[in-house]
Protein backbone atom coordinates (compact mmCIF):
# COMPACT_ATOMS: atom_id res chain seq x y z
CA UNK A 1 0.00 0.00 0.00
CA UNK A 2 1.41 3.36 -1.03
CA UNK A 3 1.78 5.91 1.78
CA UNK A 4 2.71 9.01 -0.23
CA UNK A 5 0.63 10.96 -2.72
CA UNK A 6 3.19 10.92 -5.49
CA UNK A 7 6.09 8.68 -6.43
CA UNK A 8 8.85 8.75 -9.03
CA UNK A 9 11.13 6.20 -10.61
CA UNK A 10 14.38 5.99 -8.67
CA UNK A 11 16.34 4.86 -11.70
CA UNK A 12 17.77 1.99 -9.63
CA UNK A 13 16.26 -1.43 -10.30
CA UNK A 14 16.45 -2.79 -6.75
CA UNK A 15 14.96 0.38 -5.26
CA UNK A 16 12.06 0.95 -7.66
CA UNK A 17 9.76 3.91 -7.04
CA UNK A 18 10.41 6.43 -4.27
CA UNK A 19 8.45 9.44 -2.92
CA UNK A 20 8.91 12.51 -5.10
CA UNK A 21 10.78 14.49 -2.43
CA UNK A 22 13.32 11.72 -1.77
CA UNK A 23 16.70 11.56 -3.49
CA UNK A 24 18.95 8.90 -4.93
CA UNK A 25 22.60 9.61 -4.20
CA UNK A 26 25.85 7.76 -4.27
CA UNK A 27 26.99 6.92 -0.77
CA UNK A 28 30.16 8.98 -1.13
CA UNK A 29 28.18 12.22 -1.43
CA UNK A 30 26.74 12.10 2.08
CA UNK A 31 29.37 10.09 3.99
CA UNK A 32 33.13 9.88 4.37
CA UNK A 33 35.19 6.70 4.32
CA UNK A 34 38.16 5.38 6.29
CA UNK A 35 38.92 8.76 7.86
CA UNK A 36 41.24 7.62 10.66
CA UNK A 37 43.87 4.93 11.08
CA UNK A 38 46.42 3.90 13.68
CA UNK A 39 49.90 4.90 12.51
CA UNK A 40 53.17 3.10 13.08
CA UNK A 41 53.93 5.74 15.73
CA UNK A 42 51.16 4.37 17.97
CA UNK A 43 52.42 3.52 21.47
CA UNK A 44 53.30 -0.20 21.61
CA UNK A 45 51.40 -0.62 24.89
CA UNK A 46 48.19 1.01 23.60
CA UNK A 47 45.41 -1.47 24.36
CA UNK A 48 42.22 -1.72 22.34
CA UNK A 49 39.26 -3.91 21.42
CA UNK A 50 39.70 -5.36 17.97
CA UNK A 51 36.87 -6.14 15.54
CA UNK A 52 37.60 -8.63 12.76
CA UNK A 53 35.32 -9.80 9.95
CA UNK A 54 34.45 -12.96 11.86
CA UNK A 55 33.30 -10.90 14.85
CA UNK A 56 30.40 -9.30 12.97
CA UNK A 57 27.08 -10.54 11.60
CA UNK A 58 24.33 -8.73 9.75
CA UNK A 59 21.76 -9.87 12.32
CA UNK A 60 23.62 -9.02 15.53
CA UNK A 61 26.29 -6.51 14.57
CA UNK A 62 29.47 -6.82 16.63
CA UNK A 63 29.18 -10.08 18.55
CA UNK A 64 32.55 -10.05 20.30
CA UNK A 65 35.88 -8.25 20.55
CA UNK A 66 39.48 -9.41 20.88
CA UNK A 67 41.77 -7.58 23.27
CA UNK A 68 45.22 -6.56 21.97
CA UNK A 69 48.05 -4.18 22.63
CA UNK A 70 49.33 -2.44 19.51
CA UNK A 71 52.64 -4.30 19.48
CA UNK A 72 50.89 -7.69 19.56
CA UNK A 73 47.95 -6.88 17.29
CA UNK A 74 47.46 -8.19 13.73
CA UNK A 75 48.82 -5.85 11.06
CA UNK A 76 45.28 -5.34 9.75
CA UNK A 77 44.12 -3.84 13.09
CA UNK A 78 44.27 -0.24 11.94
CA UNK A 79 40.88 1.39 11.36
CA UNK A 80 39.75 3.84 14.05
CA UNK A 81 35.97 3.99 14.47
CA UNK A 82 33.66 6.53 16.11
CA UNK A 83 30.16 6.26 17.52
CA UNK A 84 27.69 6.52 14.64
CA UNK A 85 30.06 5.00 12.07
CA UNK A 86 29.00 1.91 10.12
CA UNK A 87 31.53 -0.79 9.27
CA UNK A 88 30.93 -2.84 6.12
CA UNK A 89 33.15 -5.74 5.10
CA UNK A 90 35.03 -5.24 1.84
CA UNK A 91 36.51 -8.76 1.85
CA UNK A 92 34.62 -12.05 2.03
CA UNK A 93 31.55 -9.95 1.34
CA UNK A 94 29.38 -13.07 1.24
CA UNK A 95 29.61 -13.03 5.06
CA UNK A 96 27.56 -9.80 5.03
CA UNK A 97 29.44 -8.34 7.99
CA UNK A 98 27.79 -4.97 8.67
CA UNK A 99 27.54 -3.20 12.04
CA UNK A 100 26.91 0.25 13.46
CA UNK A 101 29.27 1.51 16.14
CA UNK A 102 27.43 2.16 19.39
CA UNK A 103 30.47 2.40 21.66
CA UNK A 104 33.76 3.60 20.21
CA UNK A 105 35.96 3.46 23.32
CA UNK A 106 39.27 1.95 22.23
CA UNK A 107 37.68 0.07 19.33
CA UNK A 108 39.80 -0.67 16.27
CA UNK A 109 38.44 -2.40 13.17
CA UNK A 110 40.18 -4.55 10.60
CA UNK A 111 41.29 -3.04 7.31
CA UNK A 112 38.91 -5.61 5.85
CA UNK A 113 36.14 -3.14 6.69
CA UNK A 114 35.19 0.14 5.10
CA UNK A 115 34.41 2.59 7.91
CA UNK A 116 31.49 4.70 6.67
CA UNK A 117 31.04 7.94 8.61
CA UNK A 118 27.79 9.96 8.33
CA UNK A 119 28.26 13.48 7.01
CA UNK A 120 24.91 14.69 5.72
CA UNK A 121 22.69 11.88 6.94
CA UNK A 122 21.16 10.69 10.22
CA UNK A 123 23.58 8.14 11.66
CA UNK A 124 20.82 5.71 12.64
CA UNK A 125 19.17 5.92 9.22
CA UNK A 126 22.57 5.30 7.63
CA UNK A 127 23.04 2.18 9.74
CA UNK A 128 19.65 0.79 8.75
CA UNK A 129 20.09 1.61 5.06
CA UNK A 130 23.50 -0.07 4.86
CA UNK A 131 22.15 -3.16 6.61
CA UNK A 132 19.33 -3.28 4.05
CA UNK A 133 19.26 -6.66 2.30
CA UNK A 134 19.36 -5.08 -1.16
CA UNK A 135 22.37 -2.87 -0.41
CA UNK A 136 24.27 -5.79 1.10
CA UNK A 137 23.45 -7.96 -1.92
CA UNK A 138 24.59 -5.18 -4.26
CA UNK A 139 27.93 -5.01 -2.46
CA UNK A 140 28.27 -8.78 -2.73
CA UNK A 141 27.34 -8.84 -6.43
CA UNK A 142 29.95 -6.20 -7.26
CA UNK A 143 32.72 -8.05 -5.46
CA UNK A 144 35.50 -9.65 -7.48
CA UNK A 145 36.97 -13.08 -6.81
CA UNK A 146 35.62 -16.57 -6.20
CA UNK A 147 37.17 -17.95 -3.02
CA UNK A 148 37.92 -14.54 -1.51
CA UNK A 149 35.51 -12.01 -3.05
CA UNK A 150 36.34 -8.38 -2.33
CA UNK A 151 35.32 -4.86 -3.28
CA UNK A 152 37.29 -1.63 -3.05
CA UNK A 153 35.90 0.90 -0.57
CA UNK A 154 35.89 3.48 -3.38
CA UNK A 155 33.62 1.23 -5.43
CA UNK A 156 31.35 0.53 -2.48
CA UNK A 157 30.67 4.20 -1.80
CA UNK A 158 29.90 4.64 -5.50
CA UNK A 159 26.72 2.58 -4.99
CA UNK A 160 23.50 4.58 -5.16
CA UNK A 161 21.15 4.55 -2.20
CA UNK A 162 17.95 6.21 -1.02
CA UNK A 163 18.24 9.51 0.84
CA UNK A 164 14.98 10.96 2.24
CA UNK A 165 14.79 14.48 3.72
CA UNK A 166 16.44 14.82 7.14
CA UNK A 167 13.19 14.92 9.11
CA UNK A 168 11.97 11.77 7.35
CA UNK A 169 15.27 10.01 8.06
CA UNK A 170 14.77 10.66 11.77
CA UNK A 171 11.16 9.45 11.68
CA UNK A 172 12.17 6.25 9.89
CA UNK A 173 15.03 5.64 12.34
CA UNK A 174 12.73 6.22 15.34
CA UNK A 175 10.16 3.81 13.87
CA UNK A 176 12.76 1.12 13.19
CA UNK A 177 14.28 1.53 16.65
CA UNK A 178 10.88 0.80 18.20
CA UNK A 179 10.04 -2.08 15.88
CA UNK A 180 13.41 -3.81 16.10
CA UNK A 181 13.42 -3.45 19.90
CA UNK A 182 10.00 -5.12 20.03
CA UNK A 183 11.20 -7.95 17.78
CA UNK A 184 14.35 -8.41 19.87
CA UNK A 185 12.22 -8.64 23.03
CA UNK A 186 9.93 -11.20 21.39
CA UNK A 187 12.93 -13.27 20.29
CA UNK A 188 14.37 -13.15 23.80
CA UNK A 189 11.05 -14.29 25.28
CA UNK A 190 10.82 -17.13 22.75
CA UNK A 191 14.37 -18.24 23.52
CA UNK A 192 13.56 -18.38 27.24
CA UNK A 193 10.42 -20.41 26.49
CA UNK A 194 12.39 -22.79 24.26
CA UNK A 195 14.94 -23.28 27.03
CA UNK A 196 12.19 -24.11 29.53
CA UNK A 197 10.59 -26.55 27.08
CA UNK A 198 13.94 -28.23 26.43
CA UNK A 199 14.45 -28.63 30.18
CA UNK A 200 10.94 -30.06 30.49
CA UNK A 201 11.63 -32.46 27.61
CA UNK A 202 14.83 -33.66 29.27
CA UNK A 203 13.02 -34.12 32.57
CA UNK A 204 10.19 -36.11 30.95
CA UNK A 205 12.63 -38.43 29.17
CA UNK A 206 14.71 -38.91 32.30
CA UNK A 207 11.63 -39.67 34.38
CA UNK A 208 10.21 -42.11 31.82
CA UNK A 209 13.38 -44.15 31.31
CA UNK A 210 14.25 -44.34 35.02
CA UNK A 211 10.84 -44.55 36.67
CA UNK A 212 8.49 -45.71 33.93
CA UNK A 213 5.31 -43.99 32.85
CA UNK A 214 3.00 -45.31 35.58
CA UNK A 215 3.10 -42.68 38.30
CA UNK A 216 1.32 -45.03 40.76
CA UNK A 217 3.87 -47.84 40.60
CA UNK A 218 5.83 -48.53 43.80
CA UNK A 219 9.51 -47.60 43.59
CA UNK A 220 12.60 -49.21 45.18
CA UNK A 221 16.13 -47.97 45.76
CA UNK A 222 18.28 -48.74 42.69
CA UNK A 223 21.52 -48.64 44.65
CA UNK A 224 22.91 -46.14 42.10
CA UNK A 225 23.22 -42.53 43.10
Tell me the role of every PLM-derived stretch:
Residues 1-18, 181-225:
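Short amphipathic coiled-coil heptad-repeat segments
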Residues 20-27, 126, 157-192, 198:
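Amphipathic alpha-helical segments
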Residues 10-11, 28-40, 51-83, 101:
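Sequence-specific dsDNA recognition surfaces
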Residues 7-40, 158, 162, 166, ...:
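Non-catalytic DNA-recognition/assembly elements of restriction-modification systems
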Residues 76-136, 140, 150-152:
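A short beta-sheet element
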Residues 6-10, 90-94, 106-113, 144-170:
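A short glycine-rich beta-alpha junction/loop motif
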Residues 40-48, 141-143, 219-222:
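Short coil/turn segments at secondary-structure boundaries
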Amino acid sequence: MKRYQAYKDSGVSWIGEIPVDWSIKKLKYYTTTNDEVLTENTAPNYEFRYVDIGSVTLQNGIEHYQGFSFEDAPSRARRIVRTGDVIVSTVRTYLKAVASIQDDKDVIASTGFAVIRPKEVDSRFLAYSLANHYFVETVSSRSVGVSYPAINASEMVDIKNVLPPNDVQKCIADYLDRKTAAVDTAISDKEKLIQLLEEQRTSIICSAVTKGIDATIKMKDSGVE
